[in-house]
């Protein structure tokens, strides 16, 4: 009985069992929550995949649509190619492209032309159309060429009869080249127009090389140039502006009707032009104008028209000689004037220049001109330096009188001859002198800006502000001494020896306003004021350095030319500046002993002869350059008699 009764369960055991069950339930609940989260993430990913599948489907549909469009365009292109092939099989069709708004037309005077002129025109027309070949355009052969080949009078538009229909052209201003009929399925592309412009720029050299020699034509040799054949189109008028020629009027001008005054040029030649319609092609042949910029003097357009100058679009103007000028040049031994890329047109070339001899030429430098530094150059010296031994300042190296730069004739009047080196040319309103008249011509009437600084008291004007400041102090002095009574005005740069020079001597008026320093001469005050203002009015033409004094600029310029005019009589060393030579001579006097009485001094080395070639020790050749040891300029030998 006692065994049947179960042992009582301990409360501690029950509590432990309950706690274990609770922990298990909590773990199961946490696991269930994690499974729910993972399920939500899987659902989101599934939704994203569905969206991506929909987008792929849309893109695939778009790709299929584009592919269908490409297939349709390919079919259109294939049919277009077949149409072009069919057109090419017919020999009556030419592939060409005409300029915008133009068509081929022959001269109205076709019946009055000779056979050789008709043949020349036929070659020009055929070459023009062959040059403009392009696969983008396919139209029938022009009627003008068909009539020319058959020997008929071309392009008689007024004559009744069947006429080949023209290609329809869009009259709008931005339509471009002529558009063929829609049944040809030809559309003008922008690339074709760019190709035509490139052909115009290159001058169609291949066409010019393949044409027959114009020199074999019976009507002349000198009317056409090697560059004839270049094609360019004027978009405004539709004219081939790079084709024009001048044909001698003696051959067929007399047969033309008298009511064509525009056919003859100003120089007696005749242009082979077509009808003056802005919508038609004007086929002419012209001498190609070489693109050279004339830097000499500006030329008025009327002067060029008087000489029969022909102009082309985008090309620089150039002189063409008149018959009178050609005769004058041929009488002097040359056919054309000598050209210089810097100086432009000069006087007619002389026979000695054609034989290889050189002539002195000085290019005008930019700011400042060369005359501001050396006072003008003709044979290598200026008004501050003596000419080399053996040369007369009034004549050339060979003793010949100077020639006029205008007509090349010798000057016989002594009053018109160039002045000597010690008589500088004066420009009105300027105190600076120049060594020769060409230098005076090249020198401007006034420096850039003129004389902008004016005194309010006396009305005098000055070029520099420091000059005006110094003048105002002397003009408004308490003792009343002005530029006329003081020691020279600042504008003139004179000394202090005036009649009323008290202000210049005591320095009461010549005082620096910045530092209070007094000076006895206005030039010294001006030079001192430049230190405060930083003005350096003398720039170097070789480098970017500027100087306050002209003498310093000349000394600096000798470092560029390599000239050392000051030579020591003891050792023969040369120096750029005179003070360097004096310092060197003091070193000789301090280190060397004085020779005894009666003992001869050492003979100094002879200075180099400026007209002896260093290599041959003989007379200077015409192509050798000689350095002027007096002023540091390079000049040519005396055998060259050409003017600058």
UniProtKB/Swiss-Prot annotation:
Annotated Gene Ontology cellular component terms: cytoplasm; cytosol; nucleoplasm; nucleus
Cross-link (Glycyl lysine isopeptide (Lys-Gly) (interchain with G-Cter in SUMO2)), chain numbering: 282, 286
Q: Point out which parts of the chain are C2H2-type zinc fingers, as ranges.
A: 453-478, 510-532, 538-560, 566-588
Cellular compartment(s): Cytoplasm; Nucleus
Which molecular function term from Gene Ontology is one that the record holds?
Answer: transcription cis-regulatory region binding
State the UniProt keywords alphabetically: Coiled coil, Cytoplasm, DNA-binding, Isopeptide bond, Metal-binding, Nucleus, Repeat, Repressor, Transcription, Transcription regulation, Ubl conjugation, Zinc, Zinc-finger
Q: How is it modified after translation?
A: Ubiquitinated by PRKN. 'Lys-48'-linked polyubiquitination by PRKN leads to degradation by the proteasome and may play a key role in regulation of neuron death.
| Skewed-composition ranges (Pro residues) | 162-176, 601-611
For the region Disordered, what residue ranges are annotated? Answer: 153-176, 324-370, 472-503, 581-623
What family does the Swiss-Prot or TrEMBL record give for this protein?
Belongs to the krueppel C2H2-type zinc-finger protein family.
Q: What is this protein called?
A: Zinc finger protein 746
- According to its UniProt entry, this protein's organism is Homo sapiens (Human)
**Gene of this entry:** ZNF746
């Amino acid at each position: 009985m006692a065994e049947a009764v179960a042992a009582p369960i301990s409360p501690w055991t029950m509590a432990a069992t309950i706690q274990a069950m609770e922990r298990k339930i909590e773990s199961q609940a946490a696991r269930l929550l994690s499974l729910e989260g993972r399920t939500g993430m899987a659902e989101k990913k599934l939704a994203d995949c569905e969206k991506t599948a929909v987008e792929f489907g849309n893109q695939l549909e778009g790709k299929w649509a584009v592919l269908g469009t490409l297939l349709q365009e390919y079919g259109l292109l294939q049919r277009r190619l077949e149409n072009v092939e069919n057109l090419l099989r017919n020999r009556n069709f030419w592939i060409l492209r005409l300029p915008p708004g133009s068509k081929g037309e022959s001269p109205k005077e076709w019946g009055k032309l000779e056979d050789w002129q008709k043949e020349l025109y036929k070659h020009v027309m055929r070459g023009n159309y062959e040059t403009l070949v392009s696969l983008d355009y396919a139209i029938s052969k022009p009627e003008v060429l068909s009539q020319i080949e058959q020997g008929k009078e071309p392009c008689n538009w007024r004559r009744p009869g069947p006429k080949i229909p023209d290609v329809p052209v869009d009259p709008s201003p931005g339509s471009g080249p002529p558009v063929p009929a829609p049944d040809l399925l030809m559309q003008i592309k922008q690339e074709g127009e760019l190709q035509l412009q490139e052909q115009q720029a290159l001058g169609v050299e291949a066409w010019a090389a393949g044409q027959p020699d114009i020199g074999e034509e019976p009507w002349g040799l000198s009317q056409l140039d090697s560059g004839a054949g270049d094609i360019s189109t004027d978009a405004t008028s539709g004219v081939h502006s790079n084709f024009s020629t001048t044909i001698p009027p003696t051959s067929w001008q007399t047969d033309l009707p008298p009511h064509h005054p525009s056919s003859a040029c100003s120089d007696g030649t005749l242009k082979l032009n077509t009808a003056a319609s802005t919508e038609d092609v004007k086929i002419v042949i012209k001498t190609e104008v070489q693109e050279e910029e004339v830097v000499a003097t500006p030329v008025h357009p009327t002067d060029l028209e008087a000489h029969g100058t022909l102009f082309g679009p985008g090309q620089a103007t150039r002189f063409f000689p008149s018959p009178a000028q050609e005769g004058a040049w041929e009488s002097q031994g040359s056919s054309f004037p000598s050209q210089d890329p810097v100086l432009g047109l000069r006087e007619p070339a002389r026979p000695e220049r054609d034989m290889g001899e050189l002539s002195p030429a000085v290019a005008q430098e930019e700011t400042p001109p060369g005359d501001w530094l050396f006072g003008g150059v003709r044979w290598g010296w200026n008004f501050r330096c003596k000419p080399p031994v053996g040369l007369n300042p009034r004549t050339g190296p060979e003793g010949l009188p100077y020639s006029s730069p205008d007509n090349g004739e010798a000057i016989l009047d002594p009053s018109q001859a160039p002045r000597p080196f010690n008589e500088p040319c004066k420009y009105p309103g300027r105190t600076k002198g120049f060594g020769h008249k060409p230098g005076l011509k090249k020198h401007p009437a006034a420096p850039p800006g003129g004389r902008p600084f004016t005194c309010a008291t006396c009305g005098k004007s000055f070029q520099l502000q420091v000059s005006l400041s110094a003048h105002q102090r002397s003009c408004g002095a308490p003792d009343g001494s002005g530029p006329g009574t003081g020691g020279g005005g600042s504008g003139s740069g004179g000394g202090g020896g005036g009649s009323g020079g008290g202000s210049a001597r005591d320095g009461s008026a010549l005082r620096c306003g910045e530092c209070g320093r007094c000076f006895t001469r206005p030039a010294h005050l001006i030079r001192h004021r430049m230190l405060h203002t930083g003005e350096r009015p003398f720039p170097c033409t070789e480098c970017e350095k500027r100087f306050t004094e002209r003498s310093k600029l000349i000394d600096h310029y000798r470092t560029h030319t390599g000239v050392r005019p000051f030579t020591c009589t003891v050792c023969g060393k040369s120096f750029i500046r005179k003070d360097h030579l004096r310092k060197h001579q003091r070193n000789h006097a301090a280190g060397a002993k004085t020779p005894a009485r009666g003992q001869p001094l050492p003979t100094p080395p002879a200075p180099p002869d400026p007209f002896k070639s260093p290599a041959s020790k003989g007379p200077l050749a015409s192509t050798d350059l000689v350095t002027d040891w007096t002023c540091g300029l390079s000049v040519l030998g005396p055998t060259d008699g050409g003017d600058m």
